């Protein structure tokens, strides 16, 4: 992905104040934001042409909830399944984490959340362009890129992935 192209974060959150707060945090950190007030709209956006690099998802939504969103997302084509970070006020987050991981969530934060922890998670997981436009851009970048030896990443100690 072109390093000058901003990553697009889909924020699926029904509470307008929380959605605006997340938008402000993400935009000030240099991300593009696509808001969705419910799971149905979020799923429509994932099925559209605009690339989505990550989803921030509330669990308690009108109509289909966050769990249903994750299940529907899992049934989509692989290029329509961006990473998901759950951000929810549920008291049962510790109990739900295994189910959320099983459904594809990379991370789960409880509201109120630590802004730096959220941004660290977004930076870590928002790495993949999805959608028709993203797939086309990735394909053209691969064709245009000269062949090179694959680089090996060095990691420190244990994984920092939070679930």
What are these regions (language model features)?
Residues 20-28:
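Charged docking surfaces used in two-component/phosphorelay signaling
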Residues 35-54:
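Acidic, metal-coordinating helix/loop segments flanking the phosphotransfer/catalytic sites
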Residues 38, 65-68:
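Acidic catalytic/metal-coordinating carboxylates
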Residues 58:
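Active-site residues of response regulator receiver
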Residues 67-80:
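Short amphipathic alpha-helix used as the core "switch/output" element in two-component signaling
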Residues 68, 91-107, 120:
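Alpha4 helix (beta4-alpha4-beta5 surface) of REC/receiver domains from two-component response regulators
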Residues 87-88:
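Hydrophobic/aromatic residues positioned on beta-strands within the core alpha/beta folds
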Residues 113-122:
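C-terminal output helix
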């Amino acid at each position: 992905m072109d390093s000058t192209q901003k990553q697009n974060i889909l924020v699926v959150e029904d509470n307008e104040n929380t959605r605006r707060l997340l938008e402000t945090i993400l935009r000030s950190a240099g991300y593009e934001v696509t808001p969705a007030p419910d799971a149905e709209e979020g799923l429509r956006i994932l099925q559209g042409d605009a690339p989505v690099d990550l989803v921030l998802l509330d669990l308690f939504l009108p109509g289909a909830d966050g769990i249903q969103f994750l299940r529907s997302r899992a049934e989509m084509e692989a290029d329509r399944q961006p990473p998901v970070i759950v951000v929810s006020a549920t008291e049962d987050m510790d109990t739900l984490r295994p189910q959320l991981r099983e459904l594809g969530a990379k991370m789960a934060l409880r509201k109120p959340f630590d802004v730096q922890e959220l941004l660290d998670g977004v930076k870590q997981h928002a790495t993949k362009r999805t959608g028709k436009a993203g797939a086309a851009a990735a394909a053209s970048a691969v064709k245009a890129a000269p062949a090179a030896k694959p680089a090996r990443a060095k990691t420190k100690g244990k994984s920092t992935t939070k679930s």
